[in-house]
Amino acid sequence: MKLNVIRLFDPWRSSLCTCPRKYSLHPYTGCSHFCLYCYATSYIGRKPSTPKVKFLERVKGDLEFIEKDAIIEMSSSSDPYPPIEEKVKLTRKTLELLLTRDVRVLITTKSHIVTRDIDLLRKIPSAIMITVTTLDDSLAKLIEPEAPPPSLRLKAIRELNMSNIPVGVRVDPIMPGVNDDPYLIAELIEVVKEAGARHIVTATYKAKWDSLSRLSQAIPEIAGKLRELYVHSGVKIHGYMYLTRNKREELLLPVVKTAIKLGLTVATCREGLNSQYFQAPSCDGSHLISLSPRSKININRS
């Protein structure tokens, strides 16, 4: 079976990936949010969001071969709700297609535009993961220059929760010297929990040369620290520069402890850490789909 635009999710064929079986679907190539830390730019370049050619037609063809109750995620690397989505509505039209099939939907986004589609999401077994790396709008503007500010993302979390659509938050990535203050992290978890988040996914920044250069240029006072931690002291895993295991545990533990204290499920993403850092049925938040009013399926970590 050869699929066209719906692809089995298999990041780098990595043993560190703990996601359940799912498919990824990207209505757009590139991403207009232009986050400095983006890993996808290392292989697709830094390009604005562009609708894929004949995308809906290709999705329709692929859906003929997708098994019942499959999880389809939009999107793992290119945000499904870039600014252009308000006009072209490609993601919305995709949801309308998915609504005609027995599939489950996981949406990962930084955009409040997702709330526009609440009417459709209430009809599909679905869950939403919204990325919030900081509560500071000015810091977010620096590291995620064209993404909606955290204040709008928090508003979206509240609106989704009030509409009974399960929502979680990705505190990802955590970057040394940028957004790693444990007190601010604890505050972030508390605020998103109050807004309605039920699950937290977290991960440390995995460096590529292009993203490392962007961060160093934007925040020159941390350039030396990043180079020391990633280039000199770090470890290479699947072509990415990782922090040492001890450093990753140090940065992620405040997230995990605060989430557990507040009664949230929590997991890390592609970190290879022990079970203390994985306190959830799934890492990606797909288990939240079982809480959707339209879902009768329980998702277990495989």
Regions found by a protein language model. Give the residues of each.
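Conserved Radical SAM active-site core
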Residues: 1-129, 133-138
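Auxiliary Fe-S-binding modules of radical SAM enzymes
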Residues: 2, 183-302
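Hydrophobic faces of well-ordered beta-strands that scaffold small-molecule active sites
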Residues: 70-72, 105-107, 128-130, 167-171, ...
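Conserved radical SAM core fold
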Residues: 73-82, 113-115, 128-147, 174-176, ...
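Charged helix-capping and loop-helix junction motifs
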Residues: 88-90, 151, 182-188
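Surface-exposed amphipathic alpha-helices with a cationic face
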Residues: 95-99, 122, 157-164, 256-260
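Active-site glycine- and acidic-residue-rich loops that bind
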Residues: 107, 175-188
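Conserved strand-turn element in the central/C-terminal portion of the radical SAM core barrel
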Residues: 146, 159-181, 238-243
